[in-house]
Amino acid sequence: MNNIQKSRNNRIIAKTAHKSDIIIGAAIGYSDDQIKPFILSLKSSGYKGRLVLFVDKLDSGAVSFLIEQEIELIWQISHRDNAMPVYGHRYYEFLDFLRKEQGVKRIMLTDVRDVIFQGNPFVGCGDESLYVFSEDSSVKLGQCPYNSEWVLNLYGNDILKKISGEIIICSGVTIGGYHNILGYLDLLCNEMSINPQIPIADQGAHNVLIGFQVSLSSTTNQGQYTLFTMSAQTGSELIEMEDSLSMMEADRL
């Protein structure tokens, strides 16, 4: 039995993991090089909770690396007969999974390929709040052609006009208490169901929900934080990050 077969048949929960904190992401079609920055920076952050990845179409190197790192793998995200793109459908999978979990107090929903950690992401986060994270505050949503298009496609021009002056909130990372995250996911999935085939519907729905949904009491972080989303970095900045991660990996060997 190879590593891929083993990983499909077993859920590994690290024996030292604190069960009350959980980080959830999706990794579809990634190589080990695409996953390592996320995993290695998290391992070096001091985080002691669970990490669950919904995965499929990983190469053998990525599977071997994730098994070695004792990551919980769930092989199902792209197996359902669903027309919604995987980056939207993952939230339905997350919601189904979390509804069955017990003893969870704090949750982080996150992208994988473009996120690195600079510390424990839950430091300073309570278990009765919802935390969202802005992109460059100098660029408003209406000034970004991509975010404008995602909102326009899902909601139309009237909603886009109302939200165009707001800062852009990144849907790639959301942190909160168990009930706060479940409430957020319920609302997000309902919004994306308006038109399930729209690309990047999660980003458009996320910004509208945070901007207008009264029941979502959220805290927006615009300053330095313990994680970093690589959305629009220069080549020199990425080279510096790559060098730091290479040293991080060498230290673990």
Language model features with spans:
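Generic preference for well-ordered alpha-helical elements
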Residues: 32-35, 91, 114, 171, ...
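Active-site donor-binding segments of glycosyltransferases and PAPS-dependent sulfotransferases
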Residues: 70-91, 234-252
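N-terminal anchoring/stem segment of glycosyltransferases
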Residues: 1-89, 96-104, 179
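Short catalytic/ligand-binding loop motif for oxyanion handling, primarily in non-cytosolic enzymes
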Residues: 61-63, 115-119, 124-125, 139-142, ...
